[in-house]
Amino acid sequence: MASNATFEVEIYGNTTKFENSLKGVNTAMSGLRGEAKNLREALKLDPANTGKMAQLQKNLQTQLGLSRDKATKLKEELSTVDKGTSAGQKKWLQLTRDLGTVETQANRLEGEIKQVEGAISSGSWNIDAKMDTKGVNSGIDGMKSRFSGLREIAVGVFRQIGSSAVSAVGNGLKGWVSDAMDTQKAMISLQNTLKFKGNGQDFDYVSKSMQTLAKDTNANTEDTLKLSTTFIGLGDSAKTAVGKTEALVKANQAFGGTGEQLKGVVQAYGQMSASGKVSAENINQLTDNNTALGSALKSTVMEMNPALKQYGSFASASEKGAISVEMLDKAMQKLGGAGGGAVTTIGDAWDSFNETLSLALLPTLDALTPIISSIIDKMAGWGESAGKALDSIVKYVKELWGALEKNGALSSLSKIWDGLKSTFGSVLSIIGQLIESFAGIDLKTGESAGSVENVSKTIANLAKGLADVIKKIADFAKKFSESKGAIDTLKTSLVALTAGFVAFKIGSGIITAISAFKKLQTAIQAGTGVMGAFNAVMAINPFVALGIAIAAIVAGLVYFFTQTETGKKAWASFVDFLKSAWDGIVSFFSGIGQWFADIWNGAVDGAKGIWQGLVDWFSGIVQGVQNIWNGITTFFTTLWTTVVTGIQTAWAGVTGFFTGLWDGIVNVVTTVFTTISSLVTGAYNWFVTTFQPLISFYKSIFGLVGSVINLAFQLILAIIRGAYQLVIGAWSGISGFFGVIFNAVSSVVSTVFSAIGSFAGSAWNVLVGVWNAVAGFFGGIFNAVKGVVSSVFSAIGSFASSAWGVVSSIWSAVSGFFSGIFNAVSSVVSGVFSALGGFASNAWGAITGIFSGVADFFSGVFDGAKNIVSGVFEAFGNFASNAWNAITGVFNGIGSFFSDIFGGVKNTIDSVLGGVTDTINNIKGSIDWVASKVGGLFKGSMVVGLTDVNLSSSGYGLSTNSVSSDNRTYNTFNVQGGAGQDVSNLARAIRREFELGRA
């Protein structure tokens, strides 16, 4: 059984856990004691059984361990007890008693364990029954310690009483005046309501009834007045309203409600009365503030109205609208009559005391109200004439202005301003010149400069207005300084009020000084004799009153413990405790002397605590007077600080105005320049983006021109190659017979090449005309292109000249070599070349027709492009003439405005020129295709078949002619170029013709 007697105690300041753990310890100890008793009985029958002895020893050791653990936990719990409260004191006494019992048990167990150890050593269970007084003496010491603790509790109680009294009085002093003012407002509201209802004569009856009700209960006069005013406003008579209010206040207190909880109850009940219906929300609010009252009210309503039982509950009846406010009023009357409303607790007594003091202050407050109101009215008059009190400040500003003029500060400022105006003028001039090129904008620049001058004039006018404002501030300060008499009157009244508070707090509640306070009220109204009234109050010795008060407290305690049931029960419990303690003390009287000494010391300490509490109480009174004076000084300090702060704020507003004005000017100018910068940047980007399609457009034009030229020369080469092939073919057939024909061929070829030259000249004239039209509009763009085209045509001319020279030399050689043969066949060849000439003539007509159509096409295209570009730039000129108006008018929309315009122009040019470009590219592709086909019709070269001609006699350098074994002919030529020709390039060209198989 001993093995099962272990446990754990877990205490974290939770009373329930602690008590449960102690129950577990007590249960374990009870089981162990029963086991020990059985072991002792067994050892009496078998004294030599050492096994039983060992079991008993282990059992006692376990009990000792549990006792020590319990004592430790009790000490820990004692250290957390607050002996300043009633519950804490009860708990402390209980824990101290338990700790003494546990310590006594532990001492006894230690003695028994030693006896068992001796029996085990001797081997025989033979223990004499004797009492160890050591543990008992320790118990007596513990008892003395507990009485010492009781003394500490008593001292703490008296100290707490003194501290609570001082705290209550101090806090009450702070709230009395505030409560009196609130009560005054509530009375004014009641009086106005009664006058409105035509019952003004009932004001004294209602107000005195509410004051009496507040004194007799824990209610606040303000709350009772407000509730009765609500009832009267809803149509109740004065008597009915008073009855309802009394019933509600008394019922709240009867069911345990405090004065603070009454506020919530009054609010909820007043809302239901005003709305004329009982809502669940208001009933819940009433119940939350006073649960007992809410429950009793619900049950009373159900009992007084049996018809409501059909709804089952108050909540259901309320939801159905079956409960009326009249039912609530009757139930509340019943509850209020049962409660009686008498003061029942110390807290209620304090509430009643505070309310009495607040009501006593009402006459004083009524007397002071007219004085303070007149002072406030005078201050209102100061406000109306404040504009006349600023002369001194205006004078100061004028003197300051004169000093600034004398020391040159204003002239420096003027120079700075002139410099700024000059800077603005220069900048605006630059902007005007920039925009002037767009037409019409320079006029707006002049208007902007005029705006800057207008701003400077406005600033000057504002400075004049500022002088008037400062003059008004000076008038106000002067008027304030002239009102010293009114301020002194206010000061005298406040001092009188302070003296009245001091006299009231010392005299009220201890002695009766009604006549003295009436004199005090009269003295305050007259403003004289304040200290005389105070001396009359203090004529009675306050220490005599103090003794009477202490005697009253003692008498009250005697009455409490002898006449009241609660006091009798407390005293009987205390007597029982003394009896139980005395039984232990009588048995062991050795410590009684020290006990009486401790009691006496406790009494002395208690008296000291009481005296210290009284000292603290009077110190609180002095501190209250100091606080009032501090409030007065704080009032005037705050007043002066407010005046100074107002002047500083006014001056800061003036300086802030000029600062904001200058910042506004800077922001406007910055915005203008930023907008213009964005405009120029956007315009530049627009030009780059807009004319990009034009570049592509003219690139396509020049590509077309190149294709046309390429087609022309392909045709020329084709004609030459075809003619040459025909000549070679004819020569192959009749070379032996028709040598004389070559003279005719020479003239025909000359005619052909003359036509070719005319064609090239016409083509060039057309190109020059096109180029001149383009160069007239974009001369700068075409200069670079013209150089390129010029070099290209120079190369083409050089090539044509060289080619013509070669052809001429070839034909010269041929005609010289075969002149006789050509003469013989001239008629035949003449017919052949006549047909060839007809073919060439027809071909040339077709070509000129094509180029005529091309020229007409380009003429129309350029006219359209010219009209489009002209229209665009005309629109741009119109836009530029109105640009400044747009800039000064709408800064926010200018970006999107230009974006839309430039985007539209760009899209227009993209669509128009893009289509033209595509058309030209298509034409170029068609011409290139024709050129490739024409070039493919007559593949060959001017040097084809030269291997069959012996050119050794021509002087052009055929130096070697040999035939290899495989019948291939190898010719070696010495090539000499014409004037301006590069021989190496010519040789490479001839070599390339051989490699390509065209020669």
Swiss-Prot record:
InterPro entries found in the cross-reference section: Tape_meas_N (IPR013491)
UniProt KW keywords: Viral release from host cell, Viral tail assembly, Virion
Chief place of localization: virion
Compartment(s) where it occurs, according to its Swiss-Prot or TrEMBL record: Virion
GO biological process terms on file: viral tail assembly
A Pfam family assignment: TMP_3
One Gene Ontology cellular component: virion component
Protein family according to the UniProt entry: Belongs to the skunalikevirus tape measure protein family.
NCBIfam families on file: tape_meas_nterm (TIGR02675)
Its biological purpose: Probable tape measure protein. Serves as a base for tail tube protein polymerization and acts as a template for tail length determination.
PANTHER family: FELS-2 PROPHAGE PROTEIN
Annotated protein name in UniProt: Probable tape measure protein
Species whose genome carries this gene: Lactococcus phage p2
